[in-house]
C-alpha cells in the first residue's frame, strides 16, 4: 500500500519557490529576446539580401531540426572548447532565445506574408518609407494574426526550460529532482511540480493574451 | 529509489536463498586450489581503475593486480572470471569462483552470507581539481564551484562539510558531471575514485588531481563462508604485501593516492 506524504515535500517550499522564480525569469528573458529575434529573422527572410536570407534560413533549419537539449549541451559543454565560457543562467537564456527565435521566425513570417496586397499599395501611395511600412502597416496586424500561435510557442519554450536542470540550473524541475532525491518522495514531488507548471502555463497564457492587444499591437 | 528497492530485494532474496541452499561449507578450498594448481578469481572487467580491460585486451587494475599477487604467492595459476555487482556473491557461493576481488565493500548484510579478508585497497569519494588550484582543506573551497551528481553520497557530504559560499552545481548523471568539469564549467569535481580515475585518464589536458577526501569505504576480498584455511592464507599474503609496500604501490599507480589506513 502506497502512502502519500506531501508534508515533507511541502516543507521544502523555499527550494521550490527559488526554482519557480528562476523558471519565470528564464521564460520572460527568452520570450522578449526570442520574439525580437524572431521578428528580425522573419524580416530578413522576406526582405534581406541573398546572403542574409540564406544565413537566416540556415539558422532556422539548424535549430528547428535538432533537439533543444543538444543545443543546450552544445552551448554549455561545447563552446568552452572554443574559449567561450558562459554561466549556467546565460547559457540557458541563450539556448532558449535561439530556440524560440527560430520558431518565432517562421510564425511571424506566416503573419507577414498574409498581409493583403492592398495595404502595401496604400502605404506606397502615401509615400511611406520601407521601414515605416514594415513597422506601422505590416507588423502590427501580422502580430495580431499570429499572436495565439506565438503565445503557444512561448509556453512550449517555458516548459522546455525544464531541461535546463540538466546543466545544473536550479529551475523548477531541478528543484523537484532535488526534493525527490532528498525526501525519497518522488511521486509527491513530481505531482506538486506538475501542478505548478500547469498553473504557470495557464497564467502565462492569460497574461500574454492580455498584454498582446494592449501593448504589442493595438487592435482596431 | 527504484534501484535501492531492487538491490535490497536482491540482497534479501540472495540472503534467503543462500542461507537455505548452502549449509556449512567444508573447509577444503585451500587444499582444492593447491591440488588443482589454479584459483578462480572473480574480478570486474568494466570498473576502472579497479578491474578493467586494458588497451591490450588484458584485464588490469588494482583488483586484478592484487588477485594476481595472491595466485602468485599461493604458487598457482590465476584464472580470472569477470563478475558483475549482482552476480559476484552467487558465483562465490556456487563455487564458480574461489575469491571475489572486485571492489567489494563490507556491510552487515553481506557479512551474513560471506566472509571477508582484511582490506586491500581504498575506495573513496573525493574532491578532485586541477593541479594549479591550491586546496588543502574544506575551507579552501569557499567561493569555488564544484560539479556533483545529484542525490549521491558526495552531494550529501558536500552539503554537510563545505562552506556555504561553495557553488554546488548538480547534474543528473556521472557523465554530465564529469563533462562539466572537463569543459571547465566548474573548477572542481566531487565523485568516486573509479569515475575520477577514468575521467582523468581520458582527459590528461585538465591536469586534475586528488584534493580532499569525502568518504572512505575500502575494498575487501570475499571468501566463501567457513573457508577459514583459505581466508587465513589470503590474509597472510595481504599483510605481507601491506608490510613490503606492494599494496601502497598498486594504490599509487592506479588511484593516484596512497592506501591510507586500511582496516583489518
Where are these regions (language model features)?
Chain B
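Extended ligand-binding regions for polar small-molecule ligands
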Residues: 65-73, 139, 144-145, 150-153, ...
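Acidic, polar ligand-binding/catalytic clefts
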Residues: 68, 72, 77-140, 207, ...
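Short helix-initiation/N-cap motifs at beta->coil->alpha
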Residues: 64, 79-90, 169-179, 215-217
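Periplasmic-binding protein-like
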Residues: 121-129, 197-239, 257-264
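Extracytoplasmic small-molecule ligand-binding "clamshell" domains
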Residues: 26-103, 244
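A ligand-binding cleft/hinge motif common to bilobed small-molecule-binding domains
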Residues: 87, 104-112, 157-160, 182, ...
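Alpha-to-beta junction loops
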Residues: 39-40, 74-77, 94-102, 144-145, ...
Amino acid at each position: 500500500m502506497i502512502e502519500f506524504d506531501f508534508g515533507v515535500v511541502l516543507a521544502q517550499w523555499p527550494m521550490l519557490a527559488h526554482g519557480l522564480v528562476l523558471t519565470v525569469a528564464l521564460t520572460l528573458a527568452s520570450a522578449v529576446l526570442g520574439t525580437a529575434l524572431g521578428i528580425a529573422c522573419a524580416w530578413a527572410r522576406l526582405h534581406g539580401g541573398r546572403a542574409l536570407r540564406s544565413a537566416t534560413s540556415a539558422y532556422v533549419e539548424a535549430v528547428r531540426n535538432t533537439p533543444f537539449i543538444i543545443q543546450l549541451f552544445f552551448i554549455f559543454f561545447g563552446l568552452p572548447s572554443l574559449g567561450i565560457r558562459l554561466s549556467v543562467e546565460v547559457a540557458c537564456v541563450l539556448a532558449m532565445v535561439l530556440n524560440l527565435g527560430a520558431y518565432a521566425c517562421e510564425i511571424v513570417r506566416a503573419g507577414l506574408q498574409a498581409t493583403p496586397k492592398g495595404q502595401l499599395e496604400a502605404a506606397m501611395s502615401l509615400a511611406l518609407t520601407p521601414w515605416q511600412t514594415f513597422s506601422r502597416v505590416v507588423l502590427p496586424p501580422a502580430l495580431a494574426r499570429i499572436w495565439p500561435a506565438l503565445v503557444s510557442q512561448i509556453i512550449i519554450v517555458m516548459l522546455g526550460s525544464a531541461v535546463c536542470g540538466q546543466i545544473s540550473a536550479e529551475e523548477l524541475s531541478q528543484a523537484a529532482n532535488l526534493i525527490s532525491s532528498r525526501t525519497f518522495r518522488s511521486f509527491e514531488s513530481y505531482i506538486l511540480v506538475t501542478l505548478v507548471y500547469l498553473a504557470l502555463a495557464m497564467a502565462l497564457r492569460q497574461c500574454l493574451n492580455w498584454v498582446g492587444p494592449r501593448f504589442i499591437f493595438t487592435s482596431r | 529509489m527504484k534501484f535501492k528497492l531492487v538491490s535490497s530485494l536482491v540482497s534479501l532474496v540472495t540472503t534467503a536463498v543462500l542461507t537455505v541452499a548452502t549449509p556449512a561449507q567444508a573447509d577444503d578450498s585451500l587444499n582444492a586450489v593447491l591440488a588443482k594448481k589454479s584459483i578462480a578469481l572473480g574480478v570486474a572487467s568494466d570498473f576502472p581503475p579497479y578491474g578493467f580491460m586494458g588497451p591490450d585486451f588484458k584485464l588490469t587494475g588494482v583488483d586484478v593486480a592484487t588477485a594476481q599477487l595472491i595466485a602468485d604467492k599461493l604458487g598457482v595459476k590465476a584464472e580470472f572470471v569477470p563478475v558483475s555487482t549482482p552476480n559476484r556473491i552467487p558465483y562465490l557461493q556456487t563455487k564458480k569462483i574461489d575469491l571475489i576481488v572486485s571492489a567489494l565493500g563490507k556491510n552487515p548484510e553481506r557479512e551474513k552470507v560471506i566472509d571477508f579478508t582484511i582490506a586491500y585497497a581504498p575506495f573513496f569519494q573525493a574532491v578532485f581539481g586541477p593541479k594549479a588550484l591550491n586546496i588543502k582543506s574544506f575551507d579552501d573551497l569557499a567561493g569555488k564551484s564544484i560539479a556533483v551528481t545529484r542525490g549521491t553520497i558526495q552531494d550529501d557530504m558536500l552539503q554537510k562539510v563545505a562552506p556555504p559560499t561553495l557553488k554546488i552545481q548538480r547534474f543528473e548523471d556521472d557523465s554530465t558531471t564529469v563533462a562539466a568539469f572537463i569543459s571547465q564549467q566548474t573548477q572542481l569535481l566531487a565523485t568516486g575514485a573509479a569515475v575520477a580515475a577514468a575521467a582523468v585518464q581520458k582527459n590528461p589536458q585538465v591536469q586534475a588531481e586528488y584534493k580532499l577526501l569525502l568518504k572512505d569505504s575500502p575494498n575487501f576480498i570475499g571468501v566463501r563462508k567457513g573457508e577459514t584455511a583459505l581466508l587465513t592464507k589470503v590474509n597472510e599474503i595481504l599483510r605481507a604485501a601491506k608490510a613490503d609496500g606492494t599494496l601502497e604501490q598498486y594504490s599509487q599507480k592506479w588511484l593516484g593516492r596512497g592506501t591510507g589506513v586500511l582496516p583489518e
